[in-house]
């Protein structure tokens, strides 16, 4: 080949590659433009939704030949990710189907595949939105009503399955019921008898299902003034009301009605037979919940009426608002703006609906979807964006919550305390306290004075003591927290009579002179292990006085701030470990922290958290200490349970971490073995990335990881057994004593304690569930008092 020819060939190759890149780039630009047009259709613009749809159909129809798969994918994604625009996209698909029947069939197949995949992967919300979309396609003459009813019937068949959890059956019934508002009218007009048959099957199931879980999930134990309805019961009542109204609802926008003359001419597709995947033990289904109600129409001022509790509009509005929070919760400003831009805000008292839904999220049982502070920050942004109305609605809601606090669930009480204190801190701690002063006449354990006391404790964490004292009326003096200062007994007037005073003073001098841990040990070694009457828990296995002198002196010297305390603990970590060899010694350390910092709850929380992180004290020691006689006076205070829950969470995180590491190691080992086997069989010796020894864990390493996980599981089980056993002991003792004395056992103390037991079950339900059979065998036996046993049975019913 001549040099010239070679040069020409190179030029042609370069031009070919450049043209190919240009085509790819142009195609990408068109795809991006199509995606943008589809995503934004139906949103606010100068033209109507209908004209937007007509324009978009023309664009998509022209591009179907080239970008068919891309369009299918975008539309099916929109169906799942933008359920609030369901009817806009079903209308779009209907218009495309009217023009291109083949594309309509391909889309239905694609949507069915998405639905089946969502069920298989346990993506329950995605499955429900896919089902809703398929149902709404009946309204657009894309899918036949008969084939949809067959699918709905198949889903209701799941309610008759044996030996599967009730939560599985519940979800399939819920998915069908929540779809009916979209398609009920069309099915009623075309297939009334088949629809009635479907509803009858649902009613039979709802009448026989167990609702043992109901009481565990209620925000309030009382049904006055608003019933605390179980979610399926409430939705069923709303569907029955919709049926009485001949399936006519007033909330869902239906743009396809404008195009009825076009859509009714289109050929319809039949859904294929869809069989729900069978139950597997590793499937996790959504847990049941109770529908939260705070307002009714009498609470709202003149203006649009709040839809009734059993109107389908209430369900649709609430579901839409919940979805907005789910979509935008990462950015509070956007979330607040989207909530206030609710499309149908002129038809409803929007501020009341938003506040009710935000509190429904905050008080959701067993746990809220997001952190408490997420909801608090959203409410603050709402108040900033709508200062004329929203603060008043929020104040009204707070008043309602406070007046109903007597029957409030203990977990929700804690969340209410956390939210209100945080909210006050963002609004200069301003509140009309005088309106609540009637609570001062009540017993200190009553929920109302207890609420104010706990709120002030939390406000103290967000401010300072003098500020709290100044903001409160003088009548509230008994509820104001004590000044948070250390009570260092070796500096008190009576210190001369204490056995460890001399060594304590030596230790102060040494630590201030920046002594080493070894020097501290040397100072402490002369303290005798006897003659210390102040520590009854010492059984001779550890030196209680040595712990007393060291812990109180060191932490008093570090009392200036959290950082000073942490630095002191870290520097003398080895001394702590040497002193805390047994669980009794660890409990003694906790006792001394409490003795020193009893007036500073937050300091106790952070110090114990630090000791757990540094493995100075074990989780089981903290649990035992919390239930000790010494802490009886603190037992109903919120901070003590904050300590217990952070202790349990720390143990849970440790187990989860070890579990994850073991799974990853096993996976790497399996891949390495598989890769080694494949390379031996590969005659061409074409290897992928080689598996190095560093990547592949040895079988011995995996075995050690298994042993560590097994030990962690044993410790976790022991922790739960300690906690639940102590609960059973103190509650049984209270009930027996009340019965013997002829007193009503239903005291404030009893309600707090039974509430805390329930809280441990619900807050840590995923971990406790693993040991439910052990708990049933060892602790929650049939001979236990029914009041205590019922809490366990309600917990088990959540996943039953």
From Swiss-Prot:
Region (Disordered): 1-26, 669-700
Modified residues (Phosphothreonine): 9
A single BP term in Gene Ontology: nuclear-transcribed mRNA catabolic process, nonsense-mediated decay
Organism: Drosophila melanogaster (Fruit fly)
Superkingdom classification of source: Eukaryota
Family of this protein: Belongs to the NCBP1 family.
Protein name in UniProt: Nuclear cap-binding protein subunit 1
Gene3D superfamilies: 1.25.40.180
UniProt entry keywords in alphabetical sequence: mRNA capping, mRNA processing, mRNA splicing, Nucleus, Phosphoprotein, RNA-mediated gene silencing
Gene Ontology molecular functions: mRNA binding; RNA cap binding
Function: Component of the cap-binding complex (CBC), which binds cotranscriptionally to the 5'-cap of pre-mRNAs and is involved in various processes such as pre-mRNA splicing and RNA-mediated gene silencing (RNAi). The CBC complex is involved in miRNA-mediated RNA interference via its interaction with Ars2 and is required for primary microRNAs (miRNAs) processing. Also involved in innate immunity via the short interfering RNAs (siRNAs) processing machinery by restricting the viral RNA production.
Keyword Phosphoprotein in record: yes
